[in-house]
A protein has these predicted regions:
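NAD(P)+-binding Rossmann beta1-loop-alpha1 motif at the extreme N-terminus of oxidoreductases
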Residues: 1-60
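NAD(P)-dependent Rossmann-like dehydrogenase/reductase catalytic/cofactor-binding core
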Residues: 3, 186, 193-194, 222-332
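Conserved active-site and cofactor/substrate-binding residues in soluble primary-metabolism enzymes
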Residues: 8, 12, 16, 75-78, ...
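Fold-independent oxyanion-binding glycine-rich loops
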Residues: 10, 33, 75, 100-103, ...
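Anion (oxyanion) recognition and catalysis
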Residues: 22, 164, 301
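Internal alpha-helical scaffold of NAD(P)-dependent oxidoreductase catalytic cores
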Residues: 27, 79, 90, 115, ...
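Rossmann-like NAD(P)(H) cofactor-binding subdomain of soluble oxidoreductases
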Residues: 51-143, 159-161
């Protein structure tokens, strides 16, 4: 069955996913600032089905009428709240939204699912796509399983069915908070893995850090339900399935062990005492783990989190003390 999609603010992942949807025979409109597909990062992808005809200016979004499309947010995390605020009149016409973007809004300190719920009472269906994959993996038809987190069974069924192929599948889950939190903590863990791989043989401490990342994800997910015994009892029963989902440990393993992860690259750079934090950021670009770590520690009321606390100490310490902080933590 053919579905209609609108992909909003698409970077390379959003474009790769749009190309995949077109390959499956769906109708896709992509709204982005740059309406040309000539960017180097884009031309390096194998995008065989998308063309300039599919691209519309993001500035025109408020003028669009909603006609049963599935809207997928595909901006980076820093652009999430900006997209919703700038195009508020468009989002007021929707009752469901799917997101490829996960993280924290650094001004309100809310998870994106909460940000949407607080801003738009009309949006009563929210879905999150998260899992172990890079954009080029989808373009090269690498076998991929991702989590699709939503509380709405109809949205879950429609997304799972519309996107399934011989090499791509969505695994449904209702645990949005844990999948969203895992997407934040994996980037913090990837920075620490990058540092550890610079100080030790590659991969020696990766599994230790990933295990702690899973524990931190679990703890922060439980925090969201403090005071509600019923949901926590259910969470405890489903703990293993949550942790082992593609959007949790699957995503962490990929991000923490791959050189192409920007957070991992950032970690390797700051492992060198001669490289400042700011220089490393300018080399790598947006570092989600760095930004989220600052927000978690300085802005939120969260108390749990070994890895968040450790990374915060590292990025606030003198350059020469970074190595000792990490070594002491790993060898404790």
């Amino acid at each position: 069955m053919t579905s209609k999609f609108r992909v909003l603010g698409a970077g390379v992942w959003g474009l790769a996913f749009s190309d995949y949807l077109l390959k499956l025979g769906h109708k896709v409109e992509v709204f982005r600032r740059d309406t040309k597909l000539s960017n180097k990062d884009i031309t390096e992808l194998k995008l065989y089905h998308i063309s300039d005809d599919n691209i519309k200016s993001l500035d025109s979004l408020n003028d669009q009428k909603s006609n049963g499309e599935i809207n997928i947010i595909a901006v980076n995390s820093k652009g999430f709240s900006e997209l919703l605020n700038k195009h508020e009149s468009y989002f007021r016409t929707l009752n469901e939204v799917v997101s490829l973007t996960k993280g924290l809004d650094h001004l309100s300190w809310k998870y994106f699912s909460d940000y949407v719920a607080g801003m738009f009472t009309n949006i009563n269906k929210y879905g999150l796509i998260s899992g172990p994959s890079f954009a080029k993996d989808l373009c090269y038809e690498k076998k991929i399983s991702v989590s699709f987190a939503t509380l709405d069974e109809e949205l879950s069924s429609s997304m799972v069915d519309a996107t399934k192929s011989s090499y791509f599948e969505m695994i449904p889950t209702t645990y949005i908070y844990h999948i969203e939190i895992a997407g934040i903590i994996k980037n913090i863990a990837a920075i620490l893995c990058g540092m550890a791989d610079k100080y030790y043989s590659k991969g020696v401490y990766s599994n230790v850090i990933i295990k702690k990342a899973c524990q931190e994800t679990w703890q922060k997910g439980i925090e969201a339900f403090n005071g509600y015994d019923g949901p926590i009892d259910v969470l405890n029963k489903d703990r293993d399935s949550i942790i082992t989902s593609p959007g949790c440990i699957g995503d962490m393993i990929l991000t923490c062990k791959q050189d192409q992860s920007r957070n991992y690259q950032f970690g390797k750079l700051i492992a060198d005492a001669d490289v400042s934090i700011e220089d490393a950021k300018s080399i790598v670009g947006t570092v989600e783990g760095y930004d989220c770590c600052i927000t978690i520690i300085e802005k939120t009321q969260s108390t749990e989190g070994e890895l968040s606390n450790l990374l915060y100490k590292i990025i606030k310490s003198q350059n020469t003390k970074r190595e000792k902080l990490l070594r002491d933590f790993l060898q404790a």
